[in-house]
C-alpha cells in the first residue's frame, strides 16, 4: 500500500492510505522477529526510494532484514514521508460501488467506489474513490488448517487452543 501510494504521488494523483493499525505496517510488527527471505534490494520500491531520497534517507545495505528492521529502516520512514495521506486506526470494513447493490447492477463499472471505514474510537465514515488497492494481506485472516480452504474437522471447536501466528523462540533472558 505504501509503495503504491509513492507511485501515485509521482503521477500527481491524490491518494489515501488506510492503515487499520496504530502504526505503519502494524501486521508486520506482529512478526517482527522473523527474518525475511528477500534481500533489501527486493524490498525497497524504486518510487518509494525516490520519495525517501528527499528526506535524506539512505537505502539499507544488502542483507536479509527481520520484519522489525524492514519497518524501522524503510516502511516507517516511507509512511512518515507520505505524511497525512496515511490514516492510522482506519479499518476498511467494506468496499462498494456508489448507488449499486445486488439488485441494481447496470453501469456498475462506471460508478466510483465507496470505501466504508471504521476508525478506532470513532464513528464510521465513507470515502469516494476512483480506484481501490487492497494491500491488507492475510495476517488477520489466516488460512484454516483443513483441505479446500475450509477448517479441518474440530478446528472451530479447538479455536481457543490454536494459534496461526509465527512463534518467537528467542531467548529474552
What is the role of each PLM region?
Residues 1-16, 164-173:
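Rossmann-like dinucleotide/flavin-binding elements
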Residues 11, 32-35, 148-154:
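Glycine-rich, phosphate-binding/catalytic loops in enzymes
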Residues 14, 85-87, 160:
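Conserved beta-strand segments of alpha/beta enzyme cores
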Residues 21-73:
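Glycine-rich active-site loop/strand segments that organize a redox cofactor
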Residues 58-141:
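Feature captures the FAD/FMN-dependent oxidoreductase FAD-binding
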Residues 67, 136-173:
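Glycine-rich dinucleotide-binding loop and its adjacent helix/turn
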Amino acid at each position: 500500500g505504501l509503495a503504491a501510494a509513492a507511485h501515485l504521488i509521482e503521477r500527481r494523483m491524490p491518494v489515501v492510505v488506510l492503515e487499520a493499525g496504530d502504526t505503519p505496517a502494524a501486521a508486520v510488527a506482529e512478526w517482527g522477529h522473523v527474518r525475511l527471505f528477500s534481500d533489501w534490494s527486493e524490498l525497497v520500491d524504486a518510487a518509494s526510494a525516490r520519495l525517501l531520497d528527499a528526506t535524506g534517507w539512505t537505502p539499507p545495505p544488502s542483507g536479509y532484514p527481520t520484519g522489525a528492521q524492514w519497518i524501522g529502516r524503510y516502511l516507517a520512514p516511507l509512511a512518515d514521508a507520505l505524511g497525512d495521506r496515511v490514516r492510522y486506526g482506519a479499518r476498511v470494513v467494506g468496499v462498494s460501488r456508489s448507488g449499486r447493490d445486488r439488485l441494481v447492477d447496470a453501469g456498475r463499472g462506471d460508478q466510483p467506489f465507496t470505501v466504508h471505514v471504521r476508525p478506532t474510537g470513532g464513528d464510521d465514515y465513507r470515502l469516494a474513490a476512483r480506484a481501490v488497492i487492497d494491500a491488507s494481506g492475510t495476517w488477520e485472516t489466516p488460512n484454516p488448517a483443513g483441505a479446500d480452504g475450509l477448517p479441518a474437522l474440530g478446528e472451530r471447536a479447538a479455536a481457543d487452543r490454536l494459534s496461526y501466528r509465527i512463534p518467537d523462540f528467542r531467548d529474552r533472558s
